[in-house]
Amino acid sequence: MAVRIAVVIGYFVVLLGIGFWAMRRARGTSEDYFIASRTTPPLVLFLTMAATNFSAFTVFGFAGAGWESGYAYYPIMAFGTGFMALTFVLIGRPTWRLGKEHGLVTPPELVYRLTGSPVLRFLFFLVMTVFTVPYLAMQPMAAGYALESLLGIPYFAGAALITVVMLLYTFRGGFRGVTRTDVFQGGMMIVLLVVAVAIIAGRFGGLSSAHRAVMNDFPELFARPGLGGIYTPGVWFGYMLLWSLCDPMFPQLFQRFYAAKSPRGLTTTMSLYPLLTGFLFLLPVTIGVLGRLSFPELPEGAAADRILPLMLAEHAPPAIEALVLTAALAALMSTLDSQLLTLSSMFARDVCEPIRDRFVRRRGTIGRSSSSGGLPAWVSKAFVVGLALVGLAIAYSPPATFRVLATQTFTGLAVLFPTVVGALYWKRMSPVAAIASIVVGEGLVAAYYLDLLPRFGTLPVVPIVVATTLVLVVGSLLLRTEPRYEPTWEPRALSRRAIAGWSVAFAALFAVGNDVWNWGDGRVSLFGFPWWVWMFAGLCVVTSGLFWLLGRALTKGRRDNL
């Protein structure tokens, strides 16, 4: 127990130290506090984007899904999330340019700048906040699981402890503190998950032997649609689409588009992302699959999300167990801190400042703050504390497994995707039609949550996004909106022929990722993994290569037309 306590305390000390170090480098402006004065270099941007996106869901949720349904979960997440990185250029590059030109910091500010609609701006803030809170709640939930297993402290006490530590270093260091802790925590998570897989597999004679033992009793874990028949081709397609639509709408990811030092950081991040997802996501899923050897059935009252700490407690030495579960804490804290910092900036800049500008005209009525654009620091920080308490309240009585909770959250955010793309690329998009599309979309999310509508053999996100896009397009055409702004995309960076060629290439890649012809194929290959696991790992490499070539083409095209 002493070793475990020392590991956890040491980890907290490092995080708080990074936060205080970042505070000393702060420049004392709102832009610096929230996006580090747009100076984040490419490698740091890549690591903070990854660490922010890979949350408790990545560690605990993926392992739980591996235990429940098998390796069918890996391609959905690895290739689907890697392919999603294409939006780092499609949305990220024009967002970065507009942010730099106009001093934008938050996602709703971008929408307001492009449409001039304060109602649409507030609606974006509301949707992003409402649908981030359940995802935010996953992080203290996972912290409670980890510390309960690690130190034996009560589940909710562990959740509260992690939340307090995270608030301390976030308030001190701002975005600089968050990105530097992301680099530390992301690297720690990757290394220690590799260690965990090696130790657990070693207890069963290596990966090949362990996989053979699992396959004898649970062959469905090595084929699609997976144990329980969850991942039918329609559901598979729905998940693949969901990640591309929802991930760039995470407010904490969206805000990082502004933080890049240059567009090169976004293209570098896009190129490296599929390589990381292809490697990293296999690790927790493998732990979950091997968990069937020790826990064919879970202990009474335990959800599948608990399989990782259960396996570590069963097979790992105390020091390794402490380090790996601390890596899991790293994953969840790197997401939680970013979520709260971004929501803090949105509350300050998209709610408080517009209200102040409208109703408070006399100079000096509201005190100045270096970190919230003219508002008292306690205003945005109090909002963050309130959100953290809401997350803890949800964690106190968790409503579902991480996977179920995440899917609901992601669908709500995906509704915003058509409006963002329309605002960036369609000059005649109507703000009124955009508002209507979001209201209709979130109404459909509620209807699907209540099981009032048919699913058509796929995830709700597919019919919902089709409906919201139709409302947006038809409404804009009927309202005949006048052009509002100049195009945000560098129109000469790629020729129309090149754009068509790239579109065909990525459409073909996405189609290969929906390989319905391989359903039911349970053949195994190297180290006992299903052969199609290696196929999707290869697709992640191909995707990375195509992204790199696209980045080069964009850079060359831009230079040629200067």
Functional labels for PLM-detected ranges:
Residues 1-523, 530, 538-543, 548-562:
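Membrane-embedded helix-loop-helix hairpins and adjacent transmembrane boundary segments
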